[in-house]
């Protein structure tokens, strides 16, 4: 059985399919009521499953009529998505952000589960045992070297 975060994620992805557009607007209160959860659960799903690294942009307006607008970043091909990720990574990247990059590659079918697990192991803090600043820089360099390889092979 899936946990609530998985269920909410699938619901939002289904909204994209049904809308046949690259933009979906949802209301926190409506989703929370629909799934009988607290709005912070929805915030968690948005912040972890619909990130830039996953290929989405988020716009949020709080308050009574507040909404969350999720826009799918349109990359017609793998090269566009890889270039988008390369721009996002910058000089350093945290382990969690690195995992989001890997999840995005997996979601787009650019890598398989086995490759994702191998890349996660390579960029894991237990593999890169050094101070945080150096580790985040090395992690970014590893990902920036891997992404073009994923794109061309």
UniProtKB/Swiss-Prot annotation:
The gene is ctsR. Negative regulator of clpC, clpB and clpP transcription by binding directly and specifically to their promoter region. InterPro entries: CtsR (IPR008463), CtsR_C (IPR041473), CtsR_C_sf (IPR041908), CtsR_N (IPR040465), CtsR_N_sf (IPR041902). Keywords: DNA-binding, Repressor, Stress response, Transcription, Transcription regulation. GO terms for molecular function: DNA binding. One of its GO terms (biological process) is regulation of DNA-templated transcription. This is Transcriptional regulator CtsR. Belongs to the CtsR family.
């Amino acid at each position: 059985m899936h946990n609530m975060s998985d269920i909410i994620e699938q619901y939002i992805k289904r909204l994209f399919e049904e809308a046949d557009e690259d933009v979906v607007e949802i209301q926190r209160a409506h989703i929370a009521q629909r799934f009988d959860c607290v709005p912070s659960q929805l915030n968690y799903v948005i912040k972890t499953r619909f990130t830039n690294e996953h290929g989405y942009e988020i716009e949020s307006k709080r308050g009574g009529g507040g909404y969350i607008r999720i826009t799918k970043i349109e990359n017609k091909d793998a090269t566009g998505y890889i270039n988008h990720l390369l721009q996002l990574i910058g000089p350093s990247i945290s382990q969690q952000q690195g995992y989001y990059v890997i999840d995005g590659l997996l979601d787009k079918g650019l890598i398989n589960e086995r490759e994702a697990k191998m890349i996660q192991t390579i960029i894991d803090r237990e593999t890169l045992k050094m101070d945080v600043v150096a580790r985040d820089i090395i992690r970014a360099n590893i990902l920036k070297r891997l992404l073009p390889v994923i794109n061309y092979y």
